[in-house]
Each structure stands twice: as C-alpha cells, then as structure tokens.
Design a protein with these regions (language model features):
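Flexible, glycine/charged-enriched surface loops at secondary-structure junctions
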Residues: 57-65, 166-169, 232-239, 269-280, ...
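Substrate-contacting helices/loops that form the catalytic groove of nucleic-acid
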Residues: 177-212, 270-291
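C-terminal accessory/binding modules appended to enzymatic or scaffolding proteins
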Residues: 201, 213, 218, 222, ...
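Glycine- and Gly-Pro-enriched alpha-helical subdomains that act as flexible
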Residues: 72-113, 244-343
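C-terminal binding/interaction regions
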Residues: 119, 123-124, 137-167, 172-174, ...
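Gly-rich Lys/Arg/Thr-decorated short loops/hinges at beta-loop-alpha junctions or inter-strand turns
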Residues: 23-35, 111-117, 193-210, 288-309, ...
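Active-site loops and adjacent core secondary-structure elements that bind or stabilize anionic groups
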Residues: 1-201, 216-234
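Active-site-proximal loop/turn and secondary-structure-junction residues that shape catalytic pockets
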Residues: 70, 127, 239-242, 250, ...
C-alpha cells in the first residue's frame, strides 16, 4: 500500500486527506481493523517511536497512551503491586499473571486516567491476549504494534463492533535521515531526531549528591525518552519505570513543572487509604469513578461531596480529604525522577519538584542561573545530571 485515503485531516472541514510516502515506496503499516484518522496516525507514529526507544534503552516491553500528539502516560513492563492494580482498575483481572506488555499498558493508561480517556495506544512488542483484554475494556481510539497474536487480534476486532483501529507497523522500518513538513505553504526540512538516550547522556552529575542507583538511571532515561516525543515545553515525573505526571505544551517552564507535579501528586493521592476506600456505588463505571476521584482530591471537592451530589456516586458520604491530610500523605512520596526537555531558567522549578518527592533530575543545563538551580538541588540533596542536549518537539 503506497497511500491511504483518510476521512479528513485535523478537522472535518479539512479535505482531502491522506498519508503516503514521498518517494513512492510502500507505507510501513497495515490497517488490520477500523479506519484510523489523521490525528490517530499522528499519535500512532509518535507513540511507536517512544515505545521503540524505551524498549531499546531498557530491554523491557513498553507501552504508551497518547492524546493529541503527546503521551498522557508511558511505562516499561514492570510487575504491578496490589495498590497499583487497584488504582488502575485491574484488580478484578488476573493481574498477578499479566504479561510484561500488559503491565506496561496498565501502568501507561493508569498514570493519568483522566487524560488517557479515548487514547491511542502504542506497544513495543507483539500484542498478546493479556494486553488485548486490558485494551478491550478501556475507552480507546486504537492501537499500533509490530504484530498481534491470533487471540489478541480476535479480541481487538470485537471492540467497537468491529470498528476499533488496529495498526501493524513494520518494526524494521527506518525513516530517511531528513524529514519535512509544510506550514502555510512553506516546506521545513531538518535532520530526524535520532539521539540515543543512554547512560553516557546522563553521566555529567553537577550536584554535590552524585549517587545514582540503577533504578534512578533507568528512570532518567525513561523520562528523557518520553520528553523526546512530547509537545514542548515539557516536563515529566517518573517513578519505577513509568511516567506519573507529564506536563506538555506549556509556554512557561515552571507551569510545566507545576502541571506535571500536580498530576504526579494526584497519582500518589489515589493510592491513599482515603481514596482506596471510597464507597462507590456498584453501578458507577470506571470512567465515572476516575472523574469523581479527580474532583474529590482537588480543591473543588464539594462538587462531589455536597448534599444532593454525593448520593449519585457513593453509598455513604465520604469525609473531606483535608489539605493537611493530603500534604501528610504526599510527604511520603520519595525517589521520584524529573526530566525536562530544556533548561530550568529559575530555581522555582526545583522548589516545586521537591514537593512531589523528586530526588533525581535530568535536564540540558545552559541557563544563566544554572548556579542557583544547582544550589537549590544541593539544599534538598537532589542529584541532577546535565545532558547538554535540548529535546524540543513540535
């Protein structure tokens, strides 16, 4: 297949639309089910590169959950804990025996479930039945992978009455070294972003604390790979091989840090006994529970706890999760890694990151205030690596 006609472009009025190879060669994909759209393919091709890089850097299967050309979550395939199984809504499945790929998607989808609603999924490895069954129960637009087992494909083809988008990509495909895009009729050309994220990139530790565990090195690489395919400006918090907060597309660096930090905080607050024991009605769906939890742990909690409202969601009225209780719980969050796609211009980013348990940071460096940023890291005993490489993505 040399080209594929699409229903429309970014919006329904943008017609005609298609994807094709400029050199006339075959497309590196096959559509096995559904009719993927323009934005679906943007998510699919960006997400595929991300999981391919994660697999190469860590040796583990990887998954990502994309929305609007940025990852809402991404992870490598480490086993789930009982608490994670609960907050990712898979405790009713055989999660203890999930394949590594299924664990990766459970983590990628579970990190920020509000943002992942209606995601496009990318998988580094052949999709197995475990992963397909997990995908089947979520609201999702589609999936791309290098292959599918017969059982997995049968499961996925049942989704959306047979209209779920399933794409197979050639894992051996390598794009040309130069890439092009047009804006306002003008063609832009640049070298493809082929930077390898490896141990050498994070070897320049500029803080007093120079101790990096193997897990910290892994999480630094995971954060930088995620940022490589996230709309800039971007910041990513990572713990145990998975993104727990991605701040994408912000014009201000500190707003990235705050946005991603709040998402990371929400991820950890969802693990608190107060949230785990919320008395949901049995009829409340997973998506409705996600929405209710998001409001409950936020500043507008009375929207879900007010008389006349709580009865719609809970069997009994939950107690308020006070600001003091939340802070006490968040103070237990430790060993978080923070990656940034460009330098921190002010030390306020470090102050905010520390509140979310950040112990390790990877960023390019190069600010006129690098010394202030380093001093603030030293104040909190944070280990920080300067990569010397910016990772903007537009």
């Amino acid at each position: 297949m040399k080209e594929l006609e699409l229903k429309y472009g970014c919006n329904p009025n943008q017609k005609p639309s298609k994807i094709y190879m400029e050199d006339g060669s075959e497309l590196p994909i096959k559509v096995l089910s559904g009719k993927p759209g323009y934005i679906n393919f943007l998510d699919a091709f960006n997400g595929w590169q991300l999981v391919r890089d994660l697999k190469k850097a860590t040796g583990l299967p990887a998954a990502t959950s994309f929305k609007h050309v940025s990852p809402a979550g991404a992870s490598i395939g480490l086993p789930l804990t009982e608490t994670l199984a609960k907050i990712y809504w898979v405790e009713d499945m055989d999660w203890q025996n999930f394949s590594p790929l299924a664990c990766a998607y459970a983590r990628a989808r579970g990190a920020d479930r509000m943002s992942s609603f209606g995601d496009f999924i990318s998988l580094s490895d052949v999709c197995d039945k475990d992963t397909a069954l997990l995908i089947k129960r979520e609201v999702s637009d589609g999936v791309i992978a290098p292959g599918y087992t017969e059982e997995a494909l049968e499961v996925l083809k049942q989704k959306k009455k047979g209209n779920y988008n399933v794409i197979q990509i050639d894992p051996e495909y390598v794009p040309a070294p130069l890439e092009h895009k047009q804006v306002f009729g003008v063609t832009f050309e640049q070298g493809r972003q082929a930077l390898a994220i490896d141990d050498e990139l994070i070897s320049n530790i500029v803080t007093e604390n120079k101790e990096l565990s193997e897990e910290a090195k892994r999480d630094m690489k995971v954060s930088l790979i995620i940022l490589k395919y996230t709309q800039s400006n971007s910041v990513c918090y990572v713990k145990d091989g998975q993104a727990i907060g991605v701040g994408a597309g912000q014009q201000s660096r500190v707003h990235c840090t705050r946005l991603a930090g709040q998402k990371a905080d929400n991820w950890f607050l969802r693990q608190s006994p107060k949230v785990l024991n919320l008395p949901f009605k049995e009829s409340i769906s997973r998506a409705e529970r996600d929405n209710a939890i998001d409001v409950y742990i936020g500043d507008e909690y009375m929207d879900v706890l007010a008389d006349g409202n709580w009865e719609k969601t809970f069997t009994e009225k939950p107690a308020v999760f006070t600001k003091e209780e939340k802070r006490a719980w968040l103070d237990q969050m430790t060993d978080v890694t923070l990656g940034s796609d460009a330098f921190f211009p002010f030390s306020d980013n470090i102050e905010r990151a520390y509140k979310s348990g950040v112990k390790y940071i990877a960023q390019p460096g190069g600010s006129v205030r690098d010394a202030d940023v380093i001093d603030t890291c030293n104040k909190y005993n944070i280990a920080m690596a300067f990569t010397g490489i910016r990772l903007f993505h537009h």
